[in-house]
Amino acid sequence: MIAPVRWLSRKDVALVNLPFASALNIIEVTLRDHGNGAFENPPKIGIHPRHDALIHAMPGWLPTQRRAGLKWIATYSSNRSVGLPSITGLLVLNDPDTGLPVCVMDAAYLTAVRTAAASAVTSKYLSPSHVRKIAVIGAGIQGLYHVEMLSLVHPAAEFHIVDIDDDAVRLLAQMVRSKARIVPVKEAEIAIRTADVVVTATSQLEEVAFQFSWVKEGSLVLPVHPRGWSEDITTASEVLLADDVAQFASYIMALGSPYRDISRVLGSVSDVITGQVTGRANDSDRIAVFNLGIAVHDVAIGSAIFDIAEQLGLGTIVSY
């Protein structure tokens, strides 16, 4: 055996039980590293075995944190119809000094957590001064974790949840650990028009489902996926940002440019955090932020899970 590798199954990752507050802090620290240029995060590359599916490779390196790894993640929306999860994947963590793998873990949980944490940190820095209502469109796992994470940043906010499946909304309300107040809403437009923060956490959409004209003055819009909004989201918003500008441009071009002038992207959320870009100038600004997911977030969250798993003796040691 050259070196031991710790295998963490989906059950093992769940047993680690990484606190949401810890995940939020990890993502904020990692965004600061990103803003200071202490990272390598090549735009994700992918293959598309089906027209409604993708498999992406996402490598990331955080020199300050001394963390390196790669996530191999698949999104198959049609899996739900046959009782399989729509998002599956693995994260491989490497020793940055030798390159040897040290851990392989299920990546579904950490993907959901880091995505919601990125939205919550974004909201911390870019929301209007008073957040009373948050619209979450989509009551799946992303919707659930967005409620959990955003309630840490906005504990007094009311969450208006929309989903085509009423049972999904009821299940979300039952599963939420925080004291967030959940209000079921039938129509996305109704929820969006009164919300101070809007999260669209549906499955991948091919057609326009949300009009930016519904967004009220001063709101922050957080799409989890690149499609689904009217093409003017990139031109009608007063401020347009992404989690990683190069990756956002690459992704949008690969999708056939569903939005208008993406050159209006001022920078990244991390640029706002480090003071290189002005985010919200006043409470009337409508701000759109495309957090499409960056590998350094996966590596940072996965590393925290790995550290706790080692301390608790979780997982299976395999030879390499």
UniProtKB/Swiss-Prot annotation:
Assigned keywords, A-Z: NAD, Oxidoreductase, Plasmid
Against SUPFAM superfamilies, the record matches this protein to: NAD(P)-binding Rossmann-fold domains
Q: Which domain of life is it from?
A: Bacteria
The cross-references to InterPro entries, in alphabetical order and at most eight, read: NAD(P)-bd_dom_sf, ODC_Mu_crystall, ODC_N
* One GO MF term: oxidoreductase activity
Which PANTHER family does this chain map to?
A: KETIMINE REDUCTASE MU-CRYSTALLIN (PTHR13812:SF19)
Q: What is its EC number?
A: 1.-.-.-
Detail the disulphide connectivity of this chain as listed in its UniProt entry.
none
Q: Does the keyword Lipoprotein apply?
A: no
The protein's name:
Nodulation efficiency protein NfeD
Question: What is known about what this protein does?
Answer: Seems to be involved in the nodulation efficiency of R.meliloti GR4 on alfalfa roots.
**Family, as annotated:** Belongs to the ornithine cyclodeaminase/mu-crystallin family.
Q: Give any Pfam family that matches.
A: OCD_Mu_crystall
Phenotypic effect of disruption? Cells lacking this gene show an impaired nodulation efficiency as compared to that of the wild-type strain GR4.
| The encoding gene | nfeD
Look up and give the organism this protein is from. Answer: Rhizobium meliloti (Ensifer meliloti)
* Gene Ontology CC: cytoplasm
Provide the coiled-coil residue spans: none
